[in-house]
Swiss-Prot record:
Top-level division of the source organism's lineage: Eukaryota
Ranges of the Extracellular topological domain: 1-36, 97-110, 174-202, 275-286
Species of origin: Chelon labrosus
Role description: Photoreceptor required for image-forming vision at low light intensity. While most salt water fish species use retinal as chromophore, most freshwater fish use 3-dehydroretinal, or a mixture of retinal and 3-dehydroretinal. Light-induced isomerization of 11-cis to all-trans retinal triggers a conformational change that activates signaling via G-proteins. Subsequent receptor phosphorylation mediates displacement of the bound G-protein alpha subunit by arrestin and terminates signaling.
Annotated localization: Membrane; Cell projection, Cilium, Photoreceptor outer segment
Locus of motif 'Ionic lock' involved in activated form stabilization: 134-136
Membrane topology: Multi-pass membrane protein
Protein name: Rhodopsin
Gene that this sequence comes from: rho
Family classification: Belongs to the G-protein coupled receptor 1 family. Opsin subfamily.
């Protein structure tokens, strides 16, 4: 084995010289230069500095403006709530431990950080699944006269939390575990060991199949069918141009969210699977650190995509920030009027960009 396994940790360095120490008790500066830990702490501070206000603003503006409280936007709000969980429960912990160079908060802190990171990522993934299914049902109409209502949105929200919890909770109760990874200042699922009594192998397979591959298959199926339906509708002119444009714009926004999720999380998933299937092989602490910390940037991109691509939300946000006035009233107002008209003819009653 090209690493050192201890009680609730695995460090990717053989302890031939006796230098390896528990990541819960000693700084891990023998793994990488101390400046790297300072850089990680600064990176996490930046994510908190941007992630908290932008997600809180998304939540506040949507609750403040009644016209934004549409069923589909409930799912988008769910993404903001999940991101806030990651920022407050995970990022603050990681920033603090990075500043100390080891997981100074101990096992409890590791469980908290690992849980919130996993929960937030899974809520985001399953929210994208619900959005993809909604787009498929509304645009492709496999169910005639279907309208995505508030009840459907609430069921979708409950579904995302149940599925995310089914992935994030088991390591807290003995099916696998959360341990420090990479530079030992952030925590994740134990892909590294076959520790007795934790059944890591079965959990990792369960997680990859049920909480990564199956959701992605559903998303790709829905958008594959959606692409065909949009082309057919455009060719046949079955619906008004306004309705088609509204549906296309909503679908485009959700597709970009899916692509951004894949860009952020696939490197982490790929490295984790490699480590799991090559347990005991040699790799450095940065091998997992880079994709793990890159994945954390997902807390920023969803609200940014929403703000950039949803003119109605952007108008409401500017109005809120400018004390009820929009200095870009002519431009944003025209866009909002156009989009409100498009929304009124959309069978999903959403607010597209």
């Amino acid at each position: 084995m090209n690493g050192t396994e201890g009680p609730y940790f695995y460090i990717p360095m053989v302890n031939t010289t006796g230098i390896v120490r528990s990541p819960y008790e000693y700084p891990q500066y023998y793994l990488v230069n101390p400046a790297a830990y300072a850089a990680l702490g600064a990176y996490m501070f930046l994510l908190i500095l941007v992630g908290f206000p932008v997600n809180f603003l998304t939540l506040y503006v949507t609750l403040e403006h009644k016209k934004l409280r549409t069923p589909l936007n409930y799912i988008l709000l769910n993404l903001a709530v999940a991101d806030l969980f990651m920022v407050l429960g995970g990022f603050t912990t990681t920033m603090y431990t990075s500043m100390h160079g080891y997981f100074v908060l101990g096992r409890l802190g590791c469980n908290v950080e690992g849980f919130f990171a996993t929960l937030g990522g899974e809520i985001a993934l399953w929210s994208l699944v619900v959005l993809a299914i909604e787009r498929w049902v509304v645009v492709c109409k496999p169910i005639s006269n279907f309208r995505f209502s508030e009840d459907h949105a609430i069921m979708g929200l409950a579904f995302t939390w149940v599925m995310a919890s089914a992935c994030a909770v088991p390591p807290l109760v003995g099916w696998s575990r959360y341990i420090p990874e990479g530079m030992q200042c952030s925590c994740g699922i134990d892909y590294y060991t076959r520790a007795e009594g934790f059944n890591n192998e079965s959990f990792v397979i369960y997680m990859f199949v049920c909480h990564f591959l199956i959701p992605l298959v559903v998303v790709f199926f829905c958008y594959g069918r959606l692409l065909c339906a949009v082309k057919e509708a455009a060719a046949a002119q079955q619906e008004s141009e306004t309705t088609q444009r509204a549906e296309r714009e909503v679908s485009r926004m959700v597709v970009i969210m899916v692509v951004a999720f894949l860009v952020c999380w696939c490197p982490y998933a790929g490295v984790a699977w490699y480590i799991f299937t090559h347990q005991g092989s040699e790799f450095g602490p940065l091998f997992m650190t880079f994709p793990a910390f890159f994945a954390k940037s997902s807390s920023i991109y969803n609200p940014m995509i929403y703000i950039c691509m949803n003119k109605q939300f952007r108008h409401c946000m500017i109005t809120t920030l400018c004390c009820g006035k929009n200095p870009f009233e002519e431009e944003e107002g025209a866009s909002t009027t156009s989009k409100t008209e498009a929304s009124s003819v959309s069978s999903s009653s959403v607010s597209p960009a």
